[in-house]
Regions:
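Conserved, well-structured beta-alpha core segment at the onset of a catalytic domain
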Residues: 2, 35, 96
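Bacterial N-terminal signal peptides that target proteins for export
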Residues: 2-15
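Intrinsically disordered and other compositionally biased segments
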Residues: 6-7, 52, 59, 234
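Hydrophobic helical h-region of N-terminal Sec-dependent signal peptides
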Residues: 17-22
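C-terminal motif of bacterial Sec signal peptides marking the signal peptidase cleavage site
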Residues: 24-27
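Bacterial signal peptide processing site
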Residues: 29-32
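Post-signal peptide N-terminal segment of mature Sec-exported envelope proteins
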Residues: 36-71
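Glycan-processing catalytic domains of CAZymes
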Residues: 58-315
Length: 315
């Protein structure tokens, strides 16, 4: 989940999930916010609520996470036709007929990874690469000087990171090691466009390019595929370093055309939309989906908190 700069008419959310039939719209029921145009306040409120719930859950006994031995499969080569499911909270529904599952690096149980592996699914592991989250097990490794402004001014639990910091980068290397050990096929590093926000550090487009390329290089060095999360202003510059993209709300904010730099190279673009109209109005959703398919996007309409309360697929 990424919170875009106030100066831009765009919001995203990554910390904020039956089978798909080709060219059909599928749903699994449930409800979400009644807000049609998903505002920055709506996105931030959902993100904060999910983060606070994760924070409370982390106070209890923490299960030991074991390394998951991958099955003897060929390495994942992302394809533009790959379909996906994205669920970062709640009990993970492993029953979708998709190519890729995008789940939380820290919170997803071993049993879920094992089930997905047994089904031949590809696993992308989500973590925030641009913010400190005070419920994560490695949180205390961040220095005070690494942490900047709050992502949500009303909540202390998550702060922007100084991505120039050697300490921050070492922590991210360790997270990539964890992803490798857990048997993830790829990673989704979130909050990688801090320079468009107010992080509390003099981060620039250049420092962001450097950090994002660092993440991609380190992921690939471990045999992991790596996805570019949002950062729509740097798509062309970063495409060569990344294997796929994850986007929020590019259909709502007319930002999808830039992803042709990925799809033209056969790289998948996994897109999530949160607009109430596309949840509730099948005709409006069909129109949006037709445009998304024409651009070779793999689009889902999902709840803000990514808990699988409902799911509509454009594939």
């Amino acid at each position: 989940m990424t919170i875009r700069s106030i100066s831009r008419p765009r919001v995203s959310l990554a910390c904020l999930g039956v089978a798909s039939v080709s060219l059909a719209l599928t749903a699994c029921g449930g409800g979400d916010s009644d807000v049609d145009e998903v505002s920055r306040a709506d996105v931030m409120a959902a993100r904060t609520a999910r983060a606070q719930a994760a924070n409370e859950a982390a106070k209890g006994p923490r299960a030991t996470i074991q390394a998951v031995q991958p099955l003897a499969t060929t390495p994942w080569v992302p394809q533009v036709t790959d379909t996906w499911q994205w669920q970062l909270s709640g009990t993970i529904n492993t029953k979708y007929n998709v190519t890729v599952y995008d789940i939380d690096l820290f919170d997803a149980p071993d049993s879920v990874l094992a089930t997905l592996r047994s089904q031949g699914k590809r696993i992308v592991c989500y973590f925030s690469a641009g913010s400190s989250e005070d419920w994560r097990p490695d949180y205390k490794q961040f220095k005070a000087s690494d942490k900047g402004n709050r992502l949500d001014p009303q909540w202390e639990g998550e702060r922007w990171l100084d991505t120039r910091s050697a300490n921050v980068r070492n922590i991210m290397k360790a997270r990539l090691d964890k992803a490798k050990a857990r048997g993830c096929d790829g990673v989704e590093p979130d909050n990688v466009d801090a320079y468009t926000n107010k992080p509390g550090f003099p981060l620039t487009a250049s420092t962001q390019l450097d950090y994002n390329r660092f993440l991609a290089t380190e992921a690939r060095a471990r045999g992991l595929k790596v996805g570019l999360k949002n950062d729509v202003d740097q798509l062309k510059a970063l495409e060569p370093s990344f294997d796929f993209a994850v986007n929020e709300q590019c259909n709502q904010y007319s930002e999808c055309s830039g992803y042709s730099v990925f799809t033209s190279k056969g790289k998948p673009v996994f897109n999530a939309e949160y607009k109430k109209l596309w949840r509730d109005d099948a005709n409006a959703r069909a129109q949006m989906c037709a445009k998304a398919r024409a651009m070779n996007l793999r689009t889902l309409v999902l709840p803000l908190n990514l808990n699988d309360a409902f799911r509509y697929s454009c594939d």
